[in-house]
């Protein structure tokens, strides 16, 4: 039962993450005119898509690498590399998303970083950068002692959850801000809840749902990578279920 709930949560998470990206892309394509890289508002349209993809979906996926039962046994280094690489990919996508909005603001002579959304977003990205470099230096490079890693691990996990929470808050405030900007025409104000508002609000609900599920899996003690010799009953069941599934796959695809 525990194993089934874990893998069902992973499937739901994958579906929610894909829907977050697809819904944001469709919103920008269908209601906001599509995409370009020319300094116009079409360049801005890359910003929400890339920020949702990087700071929410990829970041969330990278955060859960150590929750996979396959990562609980054997060498930890490959999983550390995967964890760092996915976060680096998320950060790269985020930087491109920031480039899009700053490029649009420069082209349109719009002031940078004046709204609460922008303050929250840039703070989140700065924390993400610090978190990645600290994690790379302490947990991936071999110089740090086990004592230092044990000391900083709870801090690393705490700020990881904080950054995801701030990312969700940034996305929600960004969706709201965008709708207030574009739905101020008297013929279709935001308060009349036109189709675009319903769709964008629904996208925000998807982002919140994705983030809450990531945080639930991230903070559930029975799904954390166990310390050596400290497996709980639920973790043992997850490991056994994982290897049964792996053995069944090998048997199915073995040459006759």
Swiss-Prot record:
<keyword id="KW-0349">Heme</keyword>
<keyword id="KW-0325">Glycoprotein</keyword>
<feature type="topological domain" description="Cytoplasmic">
    <location>
        <begin position="141"/>
        <end position="154"/>
    </location>
</feature>
<feature type="binding site" description="axial binding residue">
    <location>
        <position position="117"/>
    </location>
    <ligand>
        <name>heme b 1</name>
    </ligand>
</feature>
<dbReference type="GO" id="GO:0005765">
    <property type="term" value="C:lysosomal membrane"/>
</dbReference>
<feature type="transmembrane region" description="Helical">
    <location>
        <begin position="120"/>
        <end position="140"/>
    </location>
</feature>
<keyword id="KW-1133">Transmembrane helix</keyword>
<feature type="topological domain" description="Lumenal">
    <location>
        <begin position="25"/>
        <end position="40"/>
    </location>
</feature>
<feature type="binding site" description="axial binding residue">
    <location>
        <position position="83"/>
    </location>
    <ligand>
        <name>heme b 2</name>
    </ligand>
</feature>
<keyword id="KW-0560">Oxidoreductase</keyword>
<keyword id="KW-0472">Membrane</keyword>
<feature type="transmembrane region" description="Helical">
    <location>
        <begin position="155"/>
        <end position="175"/>
    </location>
</feature>
<feature type="transmembrane region" description="Helical">
    <location>
        <begin position="41"/>
        <end position="61"/>
    </location>
</feature>
<keyword id="KW-1278">Translocase</keyword>
<feature type="binding site">
    <location>
        <position position="76"/>
    </location>
    <ligand>
        <name>L-ascorbate</name>
    </ligand>
</feature>
<keyword id="KW-0967">Endosome</keyword>
<dbReference type="GO" id="GO:0140571">
    <property type="term" value="F:transmembrane ascorbate ferrireductase activity"/>
</dbReference>
<protein>
    <recommendedName>
        <fullName>Lysosomal membrane ascorbate-dependent ferrireductase CYB561A3</fullName>
        <ecNumber>7.2.1.3</ecNumber>
    </recommendedName>
</protein>
<dbReference type="GO" id="GO:0006879">
    <property type="term" value="P:intracellular iron ion homeostasis"/>
</dbReference>
<keyword id="KW-0458">Lysosome</keyword>
<dbReference type="GO" id="GO:0016491">
    <property type="term" value="F:oxidoreductase activity"/>
</dbReference>
<feature type="binding site">
    <location>
        <begin position="112"/>
        <end position="115"/>
    </location>
    <ligand>
        <name>heme b 1</name>
    </ligand>
</feature>
<comment type="function">
    <text>Transmembrane reductase that uses ascorbate as an electron donor in the cytoplasm and transfers electrons across membranes to reduce iron cations Fe(3+) into Fe(2+) in the lumen of the late endosome and lysosome. Reduced iron can then be extruded from the late endosome and lysosome to the cytoplasm by divalent metal-specific transporters. It is therefore most probably involved in endosomal and lysosomal cellular iron homeostasis.</text>
</comment>
<keyword id="KW-0408">Iron</keyword>
<feature type="domain" description="Cytochrome b561">
    <location>
        <begin position="12"/>
        <end position="219"/>
    </location>
</feature>
<feature type="binding site" description="axial binding residue">
    <location>
        <position position="156"/>
    </location>
    <ligand>
        <name>heme b 2</name>
    </ligand>
</feature>
<feature type="topological domain" description="Lumenal">
    <location>
        <begin position="105"/>
        <end position="119"/>
    </location>
</feature>
<comment type="subunit">
    <text>Homodimer.</text>
</comment>
<feature type="binding site">
    <location>
        <position position="149"/>
    </location>
    <ligand>
        <name>L-ascorbate</name>
    </ligand>
</feature>
<feature type="binding site" description="axial binding residue">
    <location>
        <position position="47"/>
    </location>
    <ligand>
        <name>heme b 1</name>
    </ligand>
</feature>
<feature type="transmembrane region" description="Helical">
    <location>
        <begin position="4"/>
        <end position="24"/>
    </location>
</feature>
<dbReference type="InterPro" id="IPR006593">
    <property type="entry name" value="Cyt_b561/ferric_Rdtase_TM"/>
</dbReference>
<feature type="topological domain" description="Lumenal">
    <location>
        <begin position="176"/>
        <end position="202"/>
    </location>
</feature>
<feature type="topological domain" description="Cytoplasmic">
    <location>
        <begin position="62"/>
        <end position="83"/>
    </location>
</feature>
<keyword id="KW-0479">Metal-binding</keyword>
<feature type="transmembrane region" description="Helical">
    <location>
        <begin position="203"/>
        <end position="223"/>
    </location>
</feature>
<dbReference type="InterPro" id="IPR043205">
    <property type="entry name" value="CYB561/CYBRD1-like"/>
</dbReference>
<feature type="glycosylation site" description="N-linked (GlcNAc...) asparagine">
    <location>
        <position position="106"/>
    </location>
</feature>
<feature type="binding site">
    <location>
        <position position="224"/>
    </location>
    <ligand>
        <name>heme b 2</name>
    </ligand>
</feature>
<feature type="transmembrane region" description="Helical">
    <location>
        <begin position="84"/>
        <end position="104"/>
    </location>
</feature>
<dbReference type="GO" id="GO:0031902">
    <property type="term" value="C:late endosome membrane"/>
</dbReference>
<feature type="topological domain" description="Cytoplasmic">
    <location>
        <begin position="1"/>
        <end position="3"/>
    </location>
</feature>
């Amino acid at each position: 039962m525990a194993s089934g709930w874990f893998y069902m949560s992973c499937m739901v998470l994958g579906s929610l993450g894909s829907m977050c990206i697809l819904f944001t892309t469709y919103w920008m394509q269908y209601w906001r005119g599509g995409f370009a890289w020319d300094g116009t508002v079409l360049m801005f349209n890359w910003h929400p898509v890339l920020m949702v993809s990087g700071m929410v979906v990829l970041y969330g996926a990278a955060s859960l690498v150590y929750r996979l039962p396959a990562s609980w046994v054997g060498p930890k280094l490959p999983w550390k590399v995967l964890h760092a690489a996915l976060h680096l990919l998320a950060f790269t996508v985020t930087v491109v998303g920031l480039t899009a909005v700053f490029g649009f603001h420069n082209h349109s002579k719009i002031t940078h970083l004046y709204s609460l959304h922008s303050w929250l977003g840039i703070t989140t990205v700065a924390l993400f950068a610090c978190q990645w470099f600290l994690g790379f230096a302490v947990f991936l490079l071999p110089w740090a002692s086990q004592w230092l890693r044990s000391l900083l691990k709870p801090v690393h996990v705490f700020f990881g959850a904080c950054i995801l929470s701030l990312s969700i808050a940034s996305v929600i405030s960004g969706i709201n801000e965008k709708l207030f900007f574009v739905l101020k025409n008297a013929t279709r104000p935001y308060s009349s809840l036109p189709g675009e508002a319903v769709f964008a609000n629904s996208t925000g609900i998807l982002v919140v749902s994705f983030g809450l599920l990531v945080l639930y899996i991230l903070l559930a003690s029975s799904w954390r990578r166990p310390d050596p010799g400290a497996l709980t009953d639920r973790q043992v069941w997850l490991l056994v279920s994982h290897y049964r599934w792996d053995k069944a796959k090998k048997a199915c695809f073995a040459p006759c």
